[in-house]
């Protein structure tokens, strides 16, 4: 409605309210009752689209359809309209002599956006368009506001996000994105269920914000008079379940991080986390590439997808590259050799890598990767071997204790998954938490808190375990070729609208 001024809008609102009043005066309910449909627009097309005009006339197929009026034309005693349901549009043809005076008057006075029910016969027009010739016309819901201009739609991107219902009415592409999102999550569940994983539910409110490096949302429980944190990860509760003997578990759920909003970040987002006893990060790599390839095949019918200007091949096996080797390959800097923090800082200065004064060598290695390498990783790439300093919950590598058995998956220069061989040594875990507490004291409010209950759980014994986290929203972005996370969230977080 960006091309409709307020005066025009107010006039249309008044006209529609007047029509509402007239309907009630005639004893017609403008917000009607249940309507039984026999077919959707998609079913009509699939069943009868290949029939000839003559075949349809001979068969005289009766149907009952419903939807929103999107176009309307005609004068006198007959008219055409297109009505839209979930799957698409179908044309209806309404004649006064077929539906009667009262129902034809309803059709004549109906507005774009009204929801209607049609009973009639399937036919094809002279130009071959599959249509329904009405024998009955029922008003189901009177629309009191005009839809956006059909030729321009919602041009204001922010309005699309704030009023998603209008976006879904006017954009079949947007509607298809969210249908695809649902299919992606369904196939993910199917894959894990078929591979012996158990879906579980764990708390969204935690007494300690743990499982990730992020700033939490804080709330207050009045009855218990205590502060709680909206979860920033699902991880630590799932690993408690591994301790308890549930050997393969996963959860798909909302996670909350009190951080910035961008094309890749929303404060409230959906994650899947899974954990498998007696596995390691290499097993989880295989699971990750096989699961994502499976989802692409089942939902899209292919493992070759387009994202922006890039053609992405999701067919396993994907590239595996140690973080240090990736930095050496793309920057020519070798972090394999032992070095002091002063030497690492000098390298950062030489290569224009921004760092903080409190950073150790491991942090600087990660900054090199994020600032110089990440943007170059277009095809699916597992980056593994993250420094211990940035991986407080991952197991140290047996061959080089500076690094961990951890990986992140990058596609089109974005992180899509994070996984590791879980740290199951309670003594080492406590020392890592203590190191994180020192970082908090130095001003890093995203550093991990001490979680004594989790350490106690580890003391009972957690088997060697591989774990994985995937951002569902980013995966949906990838598989639907969507440039912004807001395009794949039905109701993204928005600033207050300015009056």
From Swiss-Prot:
Q: Which cofactor does it need?
A: Mg(2+)
Membrane-spanning residues where? none
Compartments, as annotated in UniProt: Cytoplasm
Q: Which reaction does it catalyse?
A: tRNA(Lys) + L-lysine + ATP = L-lysyl-tRNA(Lys) + AMP + diphosphate
One Gene Ontology MF term: tRNA binding
- What's a GO biological-process term for it? lysyl-tRNA aminoacylation
Please state the protein's primary subcellular location: cytoplasm
Q: Which keywords has UniProt assigned to this entry?
A: Aminoacyl-tRNA synthetase, ATP-binding, Cytoplasm, Ligase, Magnesium, Metal-binding, Nucleotide-binding, Protein biosynthesis
InterPro entries per UniProt: Aa-tRNA-synt_II (IPR004364), aa-tRNA-synth_II (IPR006195), aa-tRNA-synth_II/BPL/LPL (IPR045864), Lys-tRNA-ligase_II (IPR002313), Lys-tRNA-ligase_II_bac/euk (IPR034762), Lys-tRNA-ligase_II_N (IPR044136), Lys-tRNA-synth_II_C (IPR018149), NA-bd_OB-fold (IPR012340)
**Cofactor, how bound (note):** Binds 3 Mg(2+) ions per subunit.
Gene3D superfamilies reported in the protein's UniProt record? Bira Bifunctional Protein, Domain 2, Nucleic acid-binding proteins
Residues binding Mg(2+) 1 are 408, 415
One GO CC term on file = cytosol
Q: What is its EC number?
A: 6.1.1.6
Task: List ligand-binding residues for Mg(2+) 2.
Answer: 415
Q: What class of enzyme is it?
A: ligase
- How is this protein organized at the quaternary level? Homodimer.
**By its UniProt entry, which PANTHER family does this protein fall under?**
LYSINE--TRNA LIGASE, CHLOROPLASTIC_MITOCHONDRIAL, LYSYL-TRNA SYNTHETASE
* Family the entry assigns: Belongs to the class-II aminoacyl-tRNA synthetase family.
Name the chain's protein.
Lysine--tRNA ligase
């Amino acid at each position: 409605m960006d091309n409709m001024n307020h005066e025009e809008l107010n006039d249309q609102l008044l006209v529609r309210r007047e029509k509402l009043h007239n309907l009630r005066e005639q004893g017609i309910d403008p917000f009607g009752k249940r309507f039984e449909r026999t077919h959707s627009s998609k079913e009509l097309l699939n069943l009868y689209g290949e029939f000839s005009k003559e075949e349809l006339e001979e068969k005289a197929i009766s149907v009952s359809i419903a939807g929103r009026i999107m176009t309307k034309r005609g004068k006198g005693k007959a008219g055409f309209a297109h009505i839209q349901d979930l799957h698409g549009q179908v044309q209806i043809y309404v004649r006064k002599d077929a539906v009667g005076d009262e129902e034809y008057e309803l059709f004549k006075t109906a507005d774009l956006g009204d929801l209607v029910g049609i009973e009639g016969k399937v036919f094809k027009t002279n130009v071959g368009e599959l249509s329904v010739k009405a024998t009955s016309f029922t008003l189901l819901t009177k629309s009191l506001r005009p839809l956006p201009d059909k030729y321009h739609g919602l041009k204001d991107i922010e309005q699309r996000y704030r009023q998603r219902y209008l976006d879904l009415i006017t954009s079949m592409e947007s509607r298809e994105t969210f249908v695809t999102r649902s299919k992606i999550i369904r196939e993910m569940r199917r894959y894990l269920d078929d591979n012996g994983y158990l879906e579980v539910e764990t708390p969204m409110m935690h007494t300690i914000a743990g499982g990730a490096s992020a700033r939490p949302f804080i709330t207050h429980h009045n009855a218990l008079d205590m502060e709680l944190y909206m979860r920033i990860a699902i991880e630590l509760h799932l690993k408690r379940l591994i301790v308890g003997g549930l050997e393969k578990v996963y959860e798909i759920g909302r996670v909350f991080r009190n951080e910035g909003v961008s094309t890749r970040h929303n404060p409230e987002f959906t994650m899947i986390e899974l954990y498998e006893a007696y596995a390691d990060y290499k097993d989880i790599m295989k699971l990750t590439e096989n699961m994502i390839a499976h989802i692409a095949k089942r939902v899209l019918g292919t493992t070759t997808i387009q994202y922006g200007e890039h053609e992405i091949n999701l067919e396993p096996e994907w590239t595996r590259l140690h973080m240090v080797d990736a930095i050496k390959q793309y920057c020519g800097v070798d972090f394999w050799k032992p070095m002091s923090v002063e030497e690492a800082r000098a390298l950062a200065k030489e290569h224009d890598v921004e760092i903080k004064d409190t950073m150790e060598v491991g942090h600087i290695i990660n900054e090199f990767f994020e600032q110089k390498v990440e943007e170059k990783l277009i095809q699916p790439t597992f980056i593994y071997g993250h420094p211990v300093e940035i991986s407080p919950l991952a197991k140290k590598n047996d061959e080089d204790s500076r690094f961990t058995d951890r990986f992140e998956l990058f596609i089109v220069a974005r992180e899509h998954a994070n996984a590791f061989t879980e740290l199951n040594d309670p003594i080492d875990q406590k020392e890592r938490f203590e190191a994180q507490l020192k970082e908090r004291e130095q001003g890093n409010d995203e550093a991990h808190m001490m979680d004594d209950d989790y350490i106690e759980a580890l003391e009972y014994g957690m088997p060697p375990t591989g774990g994985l986290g995937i951002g569902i929203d980013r995966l949906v972005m990838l598989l639907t070729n969507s440039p912004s996370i807001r395009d794949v969230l039905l109701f993204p977080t928005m600033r207050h609208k300015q009056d």
